[in-house]
UniProtKB/Swiss-Prot annotation:
InterPro entries associated with the record: Histone-fold, Histone_H2A, Histone_H2A/H2B/H3, Histone_H2A_CS
Protein family: Belongs to the histone H2A family.
Post-translational modification as stated in the protein's UniProt record: Monoubiquitination in C-terminus gives a specific tag for epigenetic transcriptional repression.
Protein name, UniProt field: Histone H2A-beta, sperm
Keyword Ribosomal protein in annotation: no
Record's keyword terms, sorted: Chromosome, DNA-binding, Nucleosome core, Nucleus, Ubl conjugation
Entries under Pfam families matching the protein: Histone
SUPFAM superfamilies the UniProt entry points to: Histone-fold
Organism this protein belongs to: Strongylocentrotus purpuratus (Purple sea urchin)
Assembly notes: The nucleosome is a histone octamer containing two molecules each of H2A, H2B, H3 and H4 assembled in one H3-H4 heterotetramer and two H2A-H2B heterodimers. The octamer wraps approximately 147 bp of DNA.
Length: 88
């Protein structure tokens, strides 16, 4: 019986962030004795959403400053000017 091609968990979950790497970090980080199969997928999705949100705001900050490249200052401005991100 021919095996199907291996499919990465990230693409299976429709994510860009690496689910396997997040799973490894959860195991190695001594957070718990066991890590469920859904936990790294959920965490990777949350991290990807946060990264996208921050990059969107930083891109806007860069455009407001008439720049085509995001610099650390734009990231800082984006986070400081957003009420919820500023709380984190």
């Amino acid at each position: 019986k021919a095996k199907g091609k291996a499919k990465r968990r990230s693409s299976r979950a429709g994510l860009q962030f690496p689910v396997g790497r997040v799973h490894r970090f959860l195991r190695k980080g001594n957070y718990a004795n066991r890590v469920g199969a859904g936990a790294p997928v959920y965490l990777a999705a949350v991290l990807e959403y946060l990264a996208a949100e921050i990059l969107e705001l930083a891109g806007n900050a860069a455009r407001d400053n008439k720049k085509t490249r995001i610099i650390p200052r734009h990231l800082q401005l984006a986070i400081r000017n957003d009420e919820e991100l500023n709380k984190l």
